[in-house]
Structures are given as structure tokens and as C-alpha cells.
């Protein structure tokens, strides 16, 4: 999701309608304009007389609420579209917020820290120092730390040589791979601001020669095609884009490749696993952390 995201629309409806709305949003807008997620409300969250499913539609400034409400109305009716609540999303400097109240993040052999906590780095740590960059903080720690921990597990037995980081964000996973494996890592993100931040972080951590992020949607960039076939892929993004990426990931990976996926809630796991199983990728390991799920798959 782009850092230009400014609004989320929420509405409650039946499950089938929720899925139709999410699919229509995905078909109508590009992933850097709008994205939708659906989930079942917990019993305590449900209001009497209202359906038990919710749709959340995240909009960038380039998409008008009116256009999305009109889209919702074609499926759910004008009354439901009008009743959808609109909430502005605060843009945050994730690192600045982290520096205010969060300790360095330790994950296996890795330590992610701000400049103010260089004292936390131990002799054998693979330390990654992150400079400030715009990013959404929701779930960032759980999903990224989960990926680092899973990567730490995988690389105790295997030694990938061709690595891809899809949705690199601040570049933490790509830098971790470069630091540990001393290999070039292809990385991309749909958000140009994230790519600029990731490039800056790579320079700051001395791995700019190995990590050169590009702006790209999925695996579409020539640099990503040139680096294939990969034997390790990271994708720490939302469930719906993860499902959509399954065929592309299959095309750019070699047999026996390890795929580490995160950005998932527990309810998202069956759908994501199904999408990748169809492409010949089987579950090897799972890690649940701070409400987020990280999956390790292997291509058969």
C-alpha cells in the first residue's frame, strides 16, 4: 500500500457481498490506488440486526470516496454504500515513532535498531540500522520480525543464492539476506517513496552494492526477470495481493525454492495456502507472532 493512503471506508454486510465488493475494488483500481480486505466480525463486535462480515477499503488520495461508494452501491445498494463509515489514516514516520518508545527488535541472528541504540548491538549480531522513512506502523513489527525469524530458521540448513524481496518496504528483509548470505538481492515495491527509503537504508548499512530496489508491481520489472530463477522469495504484504502473486512467484522460482510469506492474519491463511498449493508450493513451517502469521513454503 502506498504511503499516499489517506482514507479507509468500512461497511458491514453478508460474506458473499463482502467478497464481491473486494473483488470489484481489485478489478477497478490498481493496487497502489485502492485495496480491500474482508473478515468476519467477532461475536462481541457484531451489532444486533447487522450482518457479521466487514469490508475495509483503503484509498489513496487519487481515488475519491464518492467513486468507491458508487461502486459499492452497484453490489450492496445505495443504503449500504451511504452507511459506510470513512476514517482518515494518519501517515506516520515509523522509525521516529519506534525511537520514541520501542526497543531494538531482535530476531534470531538479526537486530533491527535505530541510531540511538547502537549500544544494543552485540559482537555476533547481524545488525540493521534503519533511518526514518514514511511507513504505516500497523502490524509492521509482527510480520517483519516473523519473516526474519523464519529466514533465520531456513538458512540454518539451506544457503540460497538467488533472492527476491517482493514489497520490500524499508528494505529490512533484503538487507538481512544480503548481510547473512553476501548475495545480491533483487527487491521491489509499488511505492516509490518506499523504494527511495530502502535504497537509502541499503547505503546506510553498507549493502547498496547488493540491494538495489526498483519500483515495480509484482514480478513485472526487467531486473526481476533477469535475476530469476530464485531459490528464496520474501513477500511481506497483504493477503489479497499475496494470493494474486502466486502464479508470478511460481514462474520466477526454481524447484526446491523457499518462499517466506507474511502480512497475514490467521483467517487469511487457508486462502493463501490454497493459492500457492495450486502452483506447486507446499507448507513447511508456520510462525504466529503478535497476531500475524508467517508461512514457509517450498516449491515442489
Swiss-Prot record:
Methylates ribosomal protein L11. GO terms for cellular component: cytoplasm. PANTHER family: ELECTRON TRANSFER FLAVOPROTEIN BETA SUBUNIT LYSINE METHYLTRANSFERASE (PTHR43648:SF1). Gene3D superfamilies: Vaccinia Virus protein VP39. It is found in: Cytoplasm. HAMAP family: Methyltr_PrmA. InterPro entries: Ribosomal_L11_MeTrfase_PrmA, Ribosomal_PrmA_MeTrfase, SAM-dependent_MTases_sf. Belongs to the methyltransferase superfamily. PrmA family. The keyword NAD does not apply. S-adenosyl-L-methionine binds at residues 144, 167, 189, 236. Pfam families: PrmA. This is Ribosomal protein L11 methyltransferase. Its main location: cytoplasm. One of its GO terms (molecular function) is protein-lysine N-methyltransferase activity. Keywords: Cytoplasm, Methyltransferase, S-adenosyl-L-methionine, Transferase. It comes from the Bacteria. It catalyses: L-lysyl-[protein] + 3 S-adenosyl-L-methionine = N(6),N(6),N(6)-trimethyl-L-lysyl-[protein] + 3 S-adenosyl-L-homocysteine + 3 H(+). One of its GO terms (biological process) is methylation. Its EC number is 2.1.1.-. Coiled coil: none annotated. The gene is prmA. It is an enzyme of class 2 (transferase).
Amino acid at each position: 500500500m502506498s504511503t499516499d493512503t489517506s482514507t479507509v471506508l468500512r461497511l458491514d454486510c453478508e460474506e458473499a457481498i463482502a467478497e464481491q465488493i473486494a473483488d470489484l475494488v481489485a478489478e477497478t483500481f490498481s493496487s497502489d490506488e485502492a485495496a480491500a480486505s474482508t473478515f468476519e466480525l467477532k461475536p462481541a463486535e457484531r451489532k444486533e440486526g447487522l450482518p457479521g462480515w466487514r469490508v475495509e477499503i483503503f484509498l489513496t488520495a487519487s481515488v475519491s470516496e464518492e467513486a468507491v461508494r458508487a461502486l459499492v452501491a452497484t453490489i450492496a445498494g445505495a443504503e449500504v454504500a451511504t452507511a459506510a463509515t470513512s476514517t482518515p489514516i494518519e501517515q506516520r514516520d515509523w522509525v521516529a515513532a519506534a525511537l520514541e518508545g520501542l526497543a531494538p527488535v531482535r530476531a534470531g541472528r538479526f537486530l533491527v535498531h535505530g541510531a540511538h541504540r547502537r549500544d544494543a548491538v552485540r559482537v555476533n549480531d547481524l545488525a540493521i540500522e534503519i533511518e526514518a522513512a514514511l511507513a504505516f506502523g500497523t502490524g509492521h513489527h509482527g510480520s517483519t520480525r516473523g519473516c526474519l525469524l523464519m529466514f533465520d530458521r531456513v538458512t540454518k540448513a539451506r544457503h540460497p543464492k538467488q533472492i527476491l524481496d517482493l514489497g520490500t518496504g524499508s528494505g529490512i528483509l533484503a538487507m538481512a539476506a544480503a548481510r547473512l548470505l553476501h548475495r545480491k538481492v533483487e527487491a521491489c515495491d509499488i511505492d516509490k517513496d518506499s523504494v527511495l527509503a530502502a535504497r537509502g537504508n541499503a547505503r546506510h548499512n553498507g549493502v547498496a552494492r547488493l540491494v538495489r530496489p526498483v519500483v515495480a508491481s509484482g514480478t513485472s520489472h526487467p531486473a526481476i526477470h533477469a535475476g530469476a530463477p530464485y531459490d528464496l522469495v520474501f513477500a511481506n504484504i497483504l493477503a489479497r495481493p499475496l494470493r494474486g502473486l502466486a502464479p508470478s512467484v511460481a514462474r520466477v522460482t526454481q524447484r526446491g525454492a523457499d518462499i517466506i510469506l507474511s502480512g497475514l492474519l490467521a483467517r487469511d491463511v487457508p486462502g493463501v495456502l490454497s493459492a500457492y498449493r495450486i502452483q506447486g508450493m507446499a507448507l513447511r513451517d508456520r510462525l504466529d507472532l503478535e497476531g500475524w502469521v508467517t508461512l514457509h513454503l517450498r516449491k515442489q
